[in-house]
C-alpha cells in the first residue's frame, strides 16, 4: 500500500513538473495596432503622447512621440523574442512636456498564446492594442 502511494505521489509530481516546464517554453510576441482615444493632456493642452513597452523584464524601448494628438495611432510595432508564457505585457503612456514628461497611465495584460485585441481604460483616455504570441514547441 505504501509503495502504491509513493508511486502515485511520484506520478503526480512528475506531471506537475512537466506542466511547469511547458509554461517555461518561450516564444515571440508581436505588439501592434496601438492607438488611443480621448487622451487628455496636462492642464488644458493637447497631449504629445508616446509609449514605453515591456514584456516581462525585457524593455523594448519607446515609440515615436505624436505631437498634439488626443486620438493617436502609433505606427510602431514592438517585437520580443523568447518570451515565457504568462509574462506580463506592459505599455506606459506618457505626455512629452518640455522639461517634464507626465505619466498618463499604464496598461498591463498577462500574455497567452494566440492573437488578442486589448482595451485599457486610463484616467484620461482609452488605449487599444493587439498582440500575438506563439509558444515554441
Name each model feature, range by range.
Residues 79-87:
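Short Pro-Gly-centered beta-turn/loop motif in secreted/extracellular proteins
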Residues 74-78, 116-118:
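Short strand-edge motifs at loop-to-beta-strand transitions and within beta-strands
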Residues 19-30, 36-42, 90, 94-137:
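C2-type phospholipid-binding modules
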